[in-house]
From Swiss-Prot:
Associates with mitochondrial leucine tRNAs. Interacts with ELAC2. One of its GO terms (molecular function) is RNA binding. This is Pentatricopeptide repeat-containing protein 1, mitochondrial. It is found in: Mitochondrion; Mitochondrion matrix. It comes from Homo sapiens. Residues 681-692 have a biased composition (Basic and acidic residues). Abundant in testes, skeletal muscle and heart. The lineage of its organism: Eukaryota, Metazoa, Chordata, Craniata, Vertebrata.
């Protein structure tokens, strides 16, 4: 036996009886840990170093070395050596790490846990309300008062933070409805439907006012497509529940259809209103006129046809209806002149179409009479729908026979548009030479002379105003219906009358005649029209009149003056005057000056404008960039080697300055339409796309 194995026998071999003594503390007579027993140095055989062993283990080794069997000791020593190696493997890491268990994990779970910890740090637990406890009705009145003052953010914060989190009150249906109505005024679609979802989660039954506010917020939303989808889904849900809408809710739905859809959907809603037995009012036709205005090509003809239907049903138009008619004359066209002539200049045929069939039966009872009135109204609407969307081939009818086009029987055409009075833009046909001026007012079907058979060229707002009587005829028609013009009516008239005409000069006199207080928008309209004509001095002459009425020019006034600054000295003088008045020009003013300089191809003037814009650090928007990119392009036929062009000889200098100017100018950031209404703007990074996605009823 070699010395190594002999040393192992003395070091490892021990009887089983002494193994228990290793775990018994000799001093206190209690069990002790195997590694925490009493330790003392012991010299191992054939070793020059001392080892720290427990006291019981030392005794065990000394006794076992004397009375153990060699063969048994050999197997026991090998087994104990393997157990010690298994126990000591991996124990070195205990000094550096305390983790005992490792699991597989993904990065997103760590991000979620980190986000939860961050939210807990940023949003502490709200404190309980310690003041006087209020009622939900008190919060309803407070939110209603704040919304009337235009403080929607404060109303939302009062409801969500103080009422729900601090006082922890159970809200009522009216608390949600008043906030949804406030969101509807500003078009805050996402928040309105969020409140509607919270309302349903609390098992609160929405009222008619709630649905009216929801349809109204869809109508006022800046994103028309997503608002239309949300409104249609809400309407489908109400139809699935057989929920009967009242007239106000139908008006909100009709308003949504007018602003987000087209005239066909408006007529569908209008027919549903009649089918449900509701009595249509002037307000109902006002929303139909809104739907007509959405069609910029044929909306003016649509508006006239809807107007005649309203009169045929015995309804008196209001001042708002007249204002909407002026908007149609300003923004919309007449469409196909031949179709318009067939539909608007033949009142007798139209009356027979709109007239319901006469019954030869005896007078019926009240219920039957009501059903008859309902049927009559439906016939009127269906006849109107057929005429509104009439194709040109259907309106013209069969071709005219050849004998009707004999040269000897041809009748002269007289175009009356050339007269400065703008009474009509029509073509008159008569056996005798017709008068040059024809008084025409299409608002009254019977007022159209029988000699007028077709329209001439109707392209400008002044031409369309002439078809409804002109300035004086329009105001006289309002007087017949006992309506007085307001400042909006006169402002719209100032936009549609022809610039430089005598009617334009009468507008200031009409202010005093009807005792209407003028506002800055009215004078800005007059200043803009004179500036577009190039009459800058005439536009400046209105400033003393404006000051005489106690009004102060704003940025829009200076912007309208900038439209007429075609000469460099006028534009630079305007910028100097604004600087003296301590008014900083905005992007719109510089855009108007840039447009005036581009029209004259004056690159020196253009560089001066850009220098002033750079000095004032006015941010640049997309419109200005588009204007300057157009100015920096060479004309398609420009050839610098063919000849000298006096207008384009300085374009290279402008291109060099423009390239350097772009690198130092700030860009204008368009704010989100709902940013100012959010209670926590810094934590809400919703974009327009997210807003659209959040408006889907299924995901609320």
């Amino acid at each position: 036996m070699d010395f190594v194995r002999l040393a192992r026998l003395f070091a490892r071999a021990r009887p089983m009886g002494l193994f228990i003594l290793q775990h018994l503390d000799p001093c206190r007579a209690r069990w002790a840990g195997g590694r925490e027993g009493l330790m003392r140095p012991m010299w191992a055989p054939f070793s020059s170093s001392s080892s720290q062993l427990p006291l019981g283990q030392e005794r065990q080794e000394n006794t076992g070395s004397l009375g153990s069997d060699p063969s048994h000791s050999n197997s026991t020593a090998t087994q104990e050596e393997d157990e010690e190696e298994e126990e000591s493997f991996g124990t070195l890491s205990d000094k550096y790490s305390s983790r005992r268990l490792f699991r597989k994990s993904a990065a997103q779970f760590h991000n979620l846990r980190f986000g939860e910890r961050r939210d807990e740090q940023m949003e502490p637990e709200p404190k309980l309300w310690r003041g006087r406890r209020n009622t939900p009705y008190w919060y309803f009145l407070q939110c209603k008062h704040l919304i009337k003052e235009g403080k929607l953010v404060e109303a939302l914060d009062l409801f969500e933070r103080q009422m729900l989190k601090e006082e922890r009150l159970q809200p009522m249906e009216s608390n949600y409805t008043v906030l949804i109505g406030g969101c509807g005024r500003v078009g805050y679609l996402k928040k309105a439907f969020n409140l509607y979802n919270q309302m349903k989660k609390r098992d609160l039954e929405p009222s008619d006012a709630t649905y009216t506010a929801l349809f109204n917020v869809c109508a006022e939303s800046p994103w028309k497509d997503s608002a239309l989808q949300s409104a249609l889904k809400l309407r489908q849900q109400l139809q699935a529940k057989n929920f009967e809408l009242n007239l106000k809710t139908y008006h909100a739905l009709l308003k949504m259809a007018a602003k987000c859809a087209d005239l066909r959907m408006c007529l569908d809603v209008f027919k549903e209103i009649i089918h449900k037995g509701h009595v249509v009012t002037e307000e109902t036709f006002s929303f139909l006129l809104m739907g007509c205005i959405q069609d910029k090509k044929t909306g003016f003809r649509y508006a006239l046809q809807v107007w005649r239907l309203m009169l045929s049903l015995g309804l008196q138009p209001s001042r708002d209806s007249y204002n909407l008619l002026l908007v149609a004359a300003r923004d919309c066209g007449l469409g196909d002149p031949q179709v318009a002539s067939e539909l608007l200049l033949k009142p007798r045929e139209e009356a027979t179409v709109l007239q319901p069939p006469v019954s030869r039966q005896r007078p019926r009872r009240t219920a039957q009479a009501k059903a008859g009135n309902l049927m009559s109204a439906m016939l009127h609407v269906e006849a109107l729908e057929r005429q509104l969307f009439l194709e040109p081939s259907q309106a013209l009818g069969p071709p005219e026979p050849p004998e009707a086009r004999v040269p000897g029987k041809a009748q002269p055409e007289v175009d009356t548009k050339a007269e400065p009075s703008h009474t009509a833009a029509l073509t008159a046909v008569a056996l005798k030479p017709p008068p040059v001026e024809l008084e025409v007012n299409l608002l009254t079907p019977g007022a159209v002379p029988p000699t007028v058979v077709s329209f001439g060229t109707v392209t400008t707002p002044a031409d369309r105003l002439a078809l409804i009587g002109g300035l004086e005829g329009f105001l006289s028609k309002m007087a017949e219906h006992r309506q007085q013009p307001d400042i909006r009516t006169l402002t719209l008239l100032a936009e549609v009358v022809e610039s430089g005409s005598p009617a334009e000069s009468l507008l200031l006199a009409l202010l005093d005649e009807h005792q209407v207080e003028a506002d800055l928008t009215f004078f800005n309209t007059l200043v803009r029209k004179k500036s577009k004509l190039g009459d800058l001095e005439g536009a400046k002459a209105l400033l003393p009149v404006l000051a005489k009425r106690g009004l102060v020019p704003n940025l829009q006034t200076f912007c309208n003056l900038a439209i007429g600054c075609h000469r460099p000295k006028d534009g630079l003088q305007l910028l100097t005057d604004m600087k003296k008045s301590q008014v900083t020009p905005n992007t719109h003013i510089y855009s108007a000056l840039i447009n005036a300089a581009i029209r004259k191809l004056n690159y020196t003037y253009l560089i001066s404008i850009l220098k002033d814009m750079k000095q004032n650090r006015v941010p640049v928007n997309e419109v200005v960039i588009r204007q300057l990119e157009f100015a920096a392009q060479y004309p398609p036929t420009f050839d610098r080697y063919q000849g000298k062009n006096t207008y384009l000889e300085k374009i290279d200098g402008f291109r060099a300055y423009y390239k350097q100017w772009l690198t130092v100018m700030p860009a204008e950031e368009t704010p989100h339409p709902w940013q100012k209404f959010r209670t926590k703007p810094q934590g809400d990074q919703d974009t327009g796309k997210e807003a659209d996605d959040g408006c889907a009823l299924g995901g609320r």
